[in-house]
Amino acid sequence: MRHFTCVQDLGDLKQALNEAFEIKKDRFQFSELGKNKTLLMIFFNSSLRTRLSTQKAAMNLGMNTIVLDVNQGAWKLETERGVIMDGDKPEHLLEAVPVMGCYCDVIGVRSFARFENKEDDYNEKILSQFIEHSDRPVFSMEAATRHPLQSFADLITIEEYKKTARPKVVMTWAPHPKSLPQAVPNSFAEWMNATDYEIVITHPEGYELDPRFVGNAKVEYDQKKAFEGADFIYAKNWSAYKDPNYGQVISTDRSWTVDAEKMALTNNAYFMHCLPVRRNMIVSDDVIESPQSIVIPEAANREISAQTVLKKILMGLSNL
């Protein structure tokens, strides 16, 4: 595997899951694979789980790691071509990216949607430039449209906790005071569509996602109806995708908060969220603190998903 930006890059998903479970049994069995290899992790946006889990995964494989926060201590980067650079951005991404590639073997990039230009966001303007100009394997640590490391961890978690071969998985929109990207819900829907699970997406009207990610999922505007018989509830806020409201908060309807009354409609479902979570906006205290909440095991699996991806990339390098 050269690059990792979506579920399709993994190839055989069942095989990738098996690799993940083997790694989870012994995280250090491939500790020589990354010897004398350096991972550069580039953050345009804040991170807790992604930063820690990916760095730990690289260390498990014997890699050296360098972490660069673009907005703290590095030069501000210009991303547009044709711009007269007489402002506060002294370096262009087109020089910075190949320079970064000189100092590492693998690059991880975290760059959220900016909500300034929908086309730029959905063409992955930042991530794609690293793939094009770095001459290194590149993987997404969350980009404008997808968060594949999170979705892989979500899938690992569901496989561990499911009680039936084809569980009903419901992704529900929930309120949030700020405008959030569609990357996590897009990615989660895409990965769930790659399984044979029953997948339902529920949200208020106006929060429809890009159809290419929704795929074969059933869309239900009645949240309580969607919850009926669910085995997993995956809560997440996202801003509007459809024009002319792209990137905007068009509702903060608190009736969409996941609470115990709604969870009682499910098949004793497990509650999932990628974290960080706004308590009593996204989910009530009693639900996230309940025995059915698996947000911590879900977060722990971020290390496993990252290590599986890095292992596959390193094996690709060793075959060159």
Positions of predicted regions on the chain:
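Hydrophobic/aromatic ligand-binding patch that stacks against planar heteroaromatic rings
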Residues: 57, 99, 130, 191, ...
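C-terminal helix-to-coil terminal segments
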Residues: 289-320
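Positively charged, low-complexity intrinsically disordered leader regions
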Residues: 1-52, 56
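Phosphate-coordination loops involved in phosphoryl transfer and adenosine-cofactor binding
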Residues: 33-39, 166-168, 268
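Glycine-rich phosphate/diphosphate-binding loop of Rossmann-like nucleotide-binding domains
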Residues: 44-67, 159-236
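Rossmann-like adenosine-cofactor binding region
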Residues: 212-287, 292-293
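Phosphate/diphosphate ligand-binding glycine-rich loop within oxidoreductases
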Residues: 32-41, 47-159, 278
